[in-house]
Design a protein with these regions (language model features):
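Conformational coupling and interaction surfaces
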Residues: 1-3, 19-23, 30, 170-174, ...
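Active-site histidine-anchored catalytic micro-motif
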Residues: 2-52, 60, 86, 92-198
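Metal-dependent C-N hydrolase catalytic cores
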Residues: 2-4, 45-115, 289-311, 319-325, ...
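Short, mixed-charge, low-aromatic patches
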Residues: 2-10, 64-69, 88-90, 129-136, ...
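Short, mixed-charge aromatic SLiMs
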Residues: 41-45, 72-73, 154-158, 266-283
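A residue-level signal for conserved active-site and pocket-lining positions in enzyme catalytic cores
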Residues: 64, 179, 249
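Short, surface-exposed amphipathic charged segments that create phosphate/polyanion-binding patches used
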Residues: 77-84, 162-166, 205-208, 285
């Protein structure tokens, strides 16, 4: 079976990094481009982390394109309290060996599917700012992709950043609303935090298994989630940290992992109290569905894919713990990377 041609939009923090390993090193994905956006961390940091993650996967051939540095109408609210100041657990990762591409993410998101209509699958792991910006220029954008998978929302209205909202939608609800209003269920599938919370939790025994593998990718995946594990223990009440972006990526790579789904009409709340909440209309009189919502996945199958991928031994230029990022700009014109434990 040929690898799935992919374009990935990411605000690369710790779980995005693991999702990039699945796509770039697992053999099921053919990653044509990674676009970055501000979300978990500021844009320059997300771009740096995407470059490092791809290096860890041995894929310095995959281009990385920076995109929007802030939400459409709001100021940036990052998740550095979850992922660390550097977005990768503050473990002192080395600077990337290459620079990102000069072309803007939105131009790439528009241009690639025009050149290859119906061929590419888009996977979004971030606030939907880049995608919404692209839609304002091409309202038919989703018809040009084979399919679009978004790690977005919480279909049970149980949130992680707010009582009823998931971070990616909460961070830029106006962008998420633009996406839902352009979507159709045959083209756009959302995998929400409710799925991750139920079927993608790395319990202590899973974390120990990851650590015992000892490969560069397994060690990377384990260590970059260090601060997420602390946050999960203190805030979510889960048995371990969960992996929302990797499970969304796994669904895109292996849709047969889906065990429960529904089609529904979804809108997004943009008011202060309910900011980012999914409004799902399941009434008989509801408007026509605009999204497919994944509700459950095969947990054993997902974790099998994860462990099989990171168990691979591949050449990589990333040496964990061998040297720390210098704090200098990681590529010409980029801001300096934050030192581990520093505060902006």
């Amino acid at each position: 079976m040929p690898a799935l041609p992919l374009v990935i939009d990411s605000d690369t923090g710790s779980d995005d990094a693991v999702a990039l390993l699945l796509a770039a090193a697992g053999g099921l994905g053919d990653v044509r481009a990674v676009t970055t956006v501000a979300g978990n961390v500021p844009l320059a940091t997300a771009t740096r982390n995407a470059l490092i993650s791809l290096e860890t996967a041995g894929r310095t051939d995959i281009p990385v394109h920076p995109g929007c540095a802030r939400p459409m109408v709001r100021s940036l609210s990052s998740a550095q309290h979850v992922h660390g100041e550097d977005g990768m657990g503050d473990i002192g990762l080395p600077d990337p060996v290459r620079a990102p591409e000069p072309s803007h993410a939105v131009d790439v998101l528009l241009g690639l599917p025009r050149d290859r209509p119906g061929e590419l699958t888009l996977v979004t792991l971030a606030p939907l700012t880049n995608i919404a910006a692209a839609l304002t220029r091409d309202p038919l954008l989703f018809t040009r992709y084979r399919h679009v998978y978004c790690m977005a929302g919480a279909a049970d209205m149980r949130g992680n950043v707010a009582p009823t909202a998931e971070f990616n939608v909460w961070a830029d609800p106006e962008a998420a609303r633009i996406v839902t209003r352009a979507a159709t269920p045959d083209k756009v599938t959302w995998v929400g935090w409710d799925v991750s919370r139920k079927d993608a939790v790395m319990a202590p025994e899973d974390q120990r298994r990851l650590e015992r593998l000892g490969t560069p990718m397994a060690t990377f995946a384990h260590r970059v989630n260090r601060t997420v594990a602390d946050w999960a223990r203190d805030v979510t009440g889960l048995a371990g940290y969960d992996l929302p972006d990797p499970v969304a990526m796994a669904v895109a790579l292996k849709p047969e992992l889906i065990t429960e789904r529904e089609q529904a009409h979804v809108d997004i709340a943009v008011g202060d109290q309910t900011r980012g909440q999914m409004i799902i209309d399941r009434r008989v009189t509801a408007p026509a569905p605009n999204l497919t919502l994944v509700r459950r996945v095969d947990e054993v199958g997902f974790k099998g894919l994860l462990f099989d991928t990171v168990a691979r031994r591949i050449p990589t230029s990333v040496s964990l713990g061998a040297r720390r990022g210098s704090g200098a700009a990681p590529w010409p014109g980029a801001p300096a990377a934050p030192a581990p434990g520093s505060r902006r």
